[in-house]
From Swiss-Prot:
Biological role stated in the UniProt entry: Retroviral envelope proteins mediate receptor recognition and membrane fusion during early infection. Endogenous envelope proteins may have kept, lost or modified their original function during evolution.
Assembly and interaction partners: The surface (SU) and transmembrane (TM) proteins form a heterodimer. SU and TM are attached by noncovalent interactions or by a labile interchain disulfide bond.
Tissue-specificity statement: Expressed in lung, placenta, testis and peripheral blood lymphocytes.
Keywords, in A-Z order: Cell membrane, Cleavage on pair of basic residues, Disulfide bond, ERV, Membrane, Transmembrane, Transmembrane helix, Transposable element, Viral envelope protein, Virion
Protein name, entry field: Endogenous retrovirus group K member 7 Env polyprotein
Organism: Homo sapiens (Human)
Location(s), subcellular: Virion
Length: 588
């Protein structure tokens, strides 16, 4: 889940291990996790604005060697000037100077700042002192001008050239020793002596020790990125030169010679810190589809002199989040209290005798859940304020250091860490602010499921896929509009207390169980109820009379049956008896 750093983003922090030769924040403890350095990765991501890429590939800024020169006090009577020069990897211009229309177009993008001086900076004899000072050159150079955009740089690009002022003969005014060499590392490794000779005086143009500050001006205009140079200069060691310019006479004419020698190189290392990383490998940028692909690339946080410029460097950062449609197997609920209340009511509404007691228990549960949420909110607020603890720790940690140089070094490291931490915490706070503005489903903590209904006709899956790749052109998901819709829906939910609907259902259930309501209903229909009662009483009386008649008939039948049974048993048993006896017997 990474996204490329583009030319429209603000400059990022790139740390160096030696601030004497390279300006910028210093940190010599990188990488933070050496065991994870160089992890393999395959990426296929999209972009909206042109990404920042360094290397020999379309869409990337090309590397080259650049020279910076300062003048020191002359120590020889035959020397016109004594120089110290620094050579290192930099950004290669496509065109040395913008001419005519291009030059006029660049003037409107000229940054604010003091112009570069007309004289070479004069420094001390100590070659270990190099003062960097930002200034704006008289003209800009083009670093890139193609389908990926136009990138220019207003930093000075010094070089030796012939001073033809006052010369009567033909004078080659063209640059003899350009500031940028095309052989890259060979000029830093093999060539340890440089000698320039001419019948014309040598001059150094663009007189200032200033770092490149590229910026995009087309198709959009973005901020300057002076931090990129710290990556290129660390890809190879810098070389320190010392020399002078002497004046001799040859063929009765003044003859000027510049001798520069080098015996000192300085290795460097530049690093980025989370959430930023460097993807190094065969990076391919496709402007038509606005995608970036890289197979079998390495994920690095530092660049040093072992870097091979056959590869390319892509700056990336971790994404804050993505928006994807999901399906749920249950209704969306904003809080666990509402879920608990709903589940309890399902089993309670059918058991009215325990309803009141259970309702009280549920309300107590709601209070407990609310209290827990309040405690969690206080804990979160305290965690956000922990930067004060970091600051206090940074101030008190000086007691552990033994030497003044170590104190300076570690203080600088702590300040850089604190600055990076503040930047990271700012991003996290913005993310938390957005999260708090959203109404999320309570049962998902790692991500937020909003109540926004996914409209497949408006945002089909191809648009979602492009959004996941990071592409945000006109054909992709308009994430800003979607966020606005979700925030509006969340605000509508925030107007109601969570669980209002469930509480309203509880109130309705209580009203239905209220006997007073029943009495009022009966009182409003008294006549109808009286008629119904009379009809019921008449039916009951009729049933009782029928029941009694049936009971009497049943008794007569039983007696007749009993008499018949007795007579049948005595049949033939009364012969020889008198008639009177027979009658008595029957009567009995």
């Amino acid at each position: 889940m990474v996204t490329p750093v583009t030319w429209m983003d603000n400059p990022i922090e790139i740390y160096v291990n030696d601030s004497v030769w390279v300006p910028g924040p210093i940190d010599d403890r990188c990488p933070a996790k050496p065991e994870e350095e160089g992890m393999m990765i395959n990426i296929s991501i999209g972009y909206r604005y042109p990404p920042i890429c360094l290397g020999r590939a379309p869409g990337c800024l090309m590397p080259a060697v650049q020279n910076w020169l300062v003048e020191v006090p002359t120590v020889s009577p035959i020397s016109r000037f004594t120089y110290h020069m620094v050579s290192g990897m930099s950004l290669r211009p496509r065109v040395n100077y913008l001419q005519d229309f291009s030059y006029q177009r660049s003037l409107k993008f000229r940054p604010k700042g003091k112009p570069c001086p007309k004289e070479i900076p004069k420094e001390s004899k100590n070659t270990e002192v190099l003062v960097w000072e930002e200034c704006v050159a008289n003209s800009a150079v083009i670093l890139q001008n193609n389908e990926f955009g136009t990138i220019i740089d207003w930093a000075p690009r010094g070089q030796f050239y012939h001073n033809c002022s006052g010369q009567t003969q033909s004078c080659p005014s063209a640059q003899v020793s350009p500031a940028v060499d095309s052989d890259l590392t060979e000029s830093l490794d093999k060539h340890k002596h440089k000698k320039l000779q001419s019948f014309y005086p040598w001059e150094w143009g663009e007189k200032r020790i200033s770092t490149p500050r590229p910026k995009i001006v087309s198709p959009v205009s973005g901020p300057e990125h002076p931090e990129l140079w710290r990556l290129t200069v660390a890809s190879h060691h810098i070389r320190i030169w010392s020399g002078n310019q002497t004046l001799e006479t040859r063929d009765c004419k003044p003859f000027y010679t510049i001798d520069l020698n080098s015996s000192l190189t300085v290795p460097l290392q530049s690093c980025v810190k989370p959430p930023y990383m460097l993807v190094v490998g065969n990076i391919v940028i496709k402007p038509d589809s606005q995608t970036i692909t890289c197979e079998n690339c390495r994920l690095l946080s530092c660049i040093d002199s072992t870097f091979n410029w056959q590869h390319r460097i892509l700056l990336v950062r971790a994404r804050e989040g993505v928006w994807i449609p999901v399906s749920m197997d249950r209704p969306w609920e904003a809080s666990p209290s509402v879920h608990i209340l709903t589940e309890v009511l399902k089993g309670v509404l059918n058991r009215s005798k325990r309803f009141i007691f259970t309702l009280i228990a549920v309300i107590m549960g709601l209070i407990a859940v609310t209290a827990t949420a309040a405690v969690a909110g206080v804990a979160l607020h305290s965690s956000v304020q922990s930067v004060n603890f970091v600051n206090d720790w940074q101030k008190n940690s000086t007691r552990l250091w033994n030497s003044q140089s170590s104190i300076d070094q570690k203080l600088a490291n702590q300040i850089n860490d604190l600055r990076q931490t503040v930047i990271w915490m700012g991003d996290r706070l913005m993310s938390l602010e957005h999260r708090f503005q959203l109404q999320c489903d309570w049962n998902t903590s790692d991500f937020c499921i909003t109540p926004q209904i996914y409209n497949e006709s408006e945002h089909h899956w191809d648009m979602v896929r492009r959004h996941l790749q990071g592409r945000e052109d006109n054909l992709t998901l308009d994430i800003s509009k979607l966020k606005e819709q979700i925030f509006e829906a969340s605000k509508a939910h925030l107007n109601l207390v969570p669980g209002t609907e469930a509480i309203a259902g509880v109130a309705d259930g209580l009203a239905n169980l209220n006997p007073v309501t029943w009495v009022k209903t009966i009182g409003s229909t008294t006549i109808i109820n009286l008629i119904l009662i009379l009809v019921c009483l008449f039916c009951l009386l009729l049933v009782c009379r029928c029941t009694q008649q049936l009971r009497r008939d049943s008794d007569h039948r039983e007696r007749a049956m009993m008499t018949m049974a007795v007579l049948s048993k005595r049949k033939g048993g009364n012969v020889g008896k008198s008639k009177r006896d027979q009658i008595v017997t029957v009567s009995v």
